[in-house]
Amino acid sequence: MAAGQREARPQVSLTFEDVAVLFTRDEWRKLAPSQRNLYRDVMLENYRNLVSLGLPFTKPKVISLLQQGEDPWEVEKDGSGVSSLGSKSSHKTTKSTQTQDSSFQGLILKRSNRNVPWDLKLEKPYIYEGRLEKKQDKKGSFQIVSATHKKIPTIERSHKNTELSQNFSPKSVLIRQQILPREKTPPKCEIQGNSLKQNSQLLNQPKITADKRYKCSLCEKTFINTSSLRKHEKNHSGEKLFKCKECSKAFSQSSALIQHQITHTGEKPYICKECGKAFTLSTSLYKHLRTHTVEKSYRCKECGKSFSRRSGLFIHQKIHAEENPCKYNPGRKASSCSTSLSGCQRIHSRKKSYLCNECGNTFKSSSSLRYHQRIHTGEKPFKCSECGRAFSQSASLIQHERIHTGEKPYRCNECGKGFTSISRLNRHRIIHTGEKFYNCNECGKALSSHSTLIIHERIHTGEKPCKCKVCGKAFRQSSALIQHQRMHTGERPYKCNECGKTFRCNSSLSNHQRIHTGEKPYRCEECGISFGQSSALIQHRRIHTGEKPFKCNTCGKTFRQSSSRIAHQRIHTGEKPYECNTCGKLFNHRSSLTNHYKIHIEEDP
């Protein structure tokens, strides 16, 4: 089109207030966690769009708070209960609160488009396109010169990876794409032709036509904008600015911190409509829904066996070959790719280039290789200052130190019990949910995790791979070996805060502490007697059932307790391990020795 035929281009002053979406304090309280996360994403996306223009720009305090995972209410107030980003924005927010729209997404959409010019004929907002003057007024606003009008692409066109790098919308396109319904035909993975589940997965696809001008100086990876480069550089620097106030764990991104904090608050915003069960993550709800539909979407190409979880397919595929799992398509219904497009492309393009010279295993990163090599070298650079125990990873040391401090930041919402790590909390939760996905082929016993199943199967095979280097005794699992080795080293890291007594294992400390508290959580359903230890309850129940599982191999007599059988067998063997220190007389029972001591006490009062 000739220059003379073009429409007159209005000059538009663009400020942060124009792209800000604000809520009153009452509105903020009513937002669900998922809605607050959407609000953060929208505000940060709008701010990044302004920064990407390359002109000087003062970061608003509300953006700094959102990047740190804080609520946007710690900025100064103007008396109206609205975040003070300026009188202009406060006025807009007050005006926007008059809306009667009960839908959060409708509200945020209305606010996000309130200042965008509309094409009354097409009923679609414009995108401003043009160059910017390299100057700022006193208010920090930018002057857009020769702005041309261009319609926002419809959802149908948005899946064609339309390049929008030269366009800038004052209101984030992300809002509209999240609120408008998904298109019926899912986007395709260009490498395998596999379909993707969500439009957002296509939006995460690298912009193929964009000029990747920002390069990482360490690994030379390129990015299309500075914000992506800064996020990536944190992987090299180890910078973790976002710290959890509960457990002090640090994260490189605010979104990771927000997701982590749910483990402390116990918030479960995702609810199953079938059974009412709640989950902290949408992915956990998605996995749970398969238990109702009995859907098994992940199929092994080798043998045709199907699994309801992709992790189950990965574990199964190791039976066929100890190779890269990407050899087999972990996709849905045996053909379509279940990962996001960006994840799918990484799987196909990435190679395991870090080789271990000891065992030949390959790894995708040098840090993973370093962690692995400590298995061969025995290197444990992270040492506990309290007991001197060393660990190969810093995370293991942090978890261990909680034994000494007594800190248990992860708490069960059902019973209130605390745990030192999230993995132990997850194992404990299975007690309440009763979920058991792994069945033993020998005895049919159901177990809650694959690792527990492997340890259980060693009962049938007799395998004991964990061997003590001092005495040669073997164990089925490493935790039993570690506990046994403390007999040789004399290490007793678990200390009672009441009396100072120390123990080799945490369970012994827990049982001991009930002496001080008087707690007896194990109750017999038959007679109502309570016990401080579960083993005592098990032995007691045999009185009601009449069960005597311990049998003497010599005479066939049976006993309720193994200790009673051991004492009985001394009658046949003639063993008398208990000796009187006064007269040297031997006894086969400790109780007999105790009664014998009374004779000497009476003789020498």
UniProtKB/Swiss-Prot annotation:
Subcellular location: Nucleus
Chief place where the protein resides: nucleus
Gene Ontology process terms (BP): regulation of transcription by RNA polymerase II; sensory perception of sound
Linked residues for Glycyl lysine isopeptide (Lys-Gly) (interchain with G-Cter in SUMO2): K110, K121, K139, K171, K268
Region (Disordered): 74-106
GO MF term (any one): RNA polymerase II cis-regulatory region sequence-specific DNA binding
N-terminal signal peptide: none
A GO CC term assigned to this protein in UniProt: nucleolus
Zinc finger (C2H2-type): 214-236, 242-264, 270-292, 298-320, 354-376, 382-404, 410-432, 438-460, 464-488, 494-516, 522-544, 550-572, 578-600
UniProt-listed Pfam families: KRAB, zf-C2H2
Domain of life assignment: Eukaryota
Record PROSITE patterns: KRAB, ZINC_FINGER_C2H2_1, ZINC_FINGER_C2H2_2
Similarity field: Belongs to the krueppel C2H2-type zinc-finger protein family.
Name of protein: Zinc finger protein 354A
Lineage: Eukaryota, Metazoa, Chordata, Craniata, Vertebrata
The gene coding this protein: ZNF354A
